[in-house]
Amino acid sequence: MRKIDKYRGIVGFLDPEMIILKRINEEADEVEAYIVKALLAQQDKECIFVVCQEGYHWALLVIFPKWNTVYNIDSKGYQSPSCYSIKKLFDEAFGAYVDKKGRHNKNFGRTVIWKHFQAHIQPPGSMLCGQYVMYHMLSFADNLSLDRDRYPQGRAGFATCPLLPDEIANVRERLLDFFMNEVIDIGGSCRVEGASYN
């Protein structure tokens, strides 16, 4: 059994290439349509990870469609949801998703609740935001796969101290292992069939 199977049915993903600042600014309608289509295709997931790029910084958003909730996990510390370029676009896309009968909390209708999720804070001046995003994503998914009721309803979060070098090395090793064993086959081709929602 492949290692990724423990996450199957639990987590989904939006394509980070579709959520970069440049594309949001230049192709907002296409990005919104992509988000609606991807949410509908993955509405049975417990959560959907969105790695979004804000200028030269990466942050993680975790969408819980059934709760109308988005958690922002940012290694820069607390960031108001309004500072993310995707917020307005995502709110509109979620409304369209609800209109198309996507899974959501009927008590909130089209409203999206944005919440901050405490995260490890990267050292000032470091260029490790991508590794922090991956660490938070892997840790979140690991905990979610073990105890679905623990996140995010309870008081949950990460410590705010910087990651230790061995923790960053572990993230890199896990990612390399994932790509070499789950994504790329022996011939160097991608194993994932039909992975696009475009």
Q: Where is each model-derived feature located?
A:
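A structural/positional concept
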Residues: M1-D5
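Cysteine protease-like catalytic core of ubiquitin/ubiquitin-like
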Residues: Y7-N198
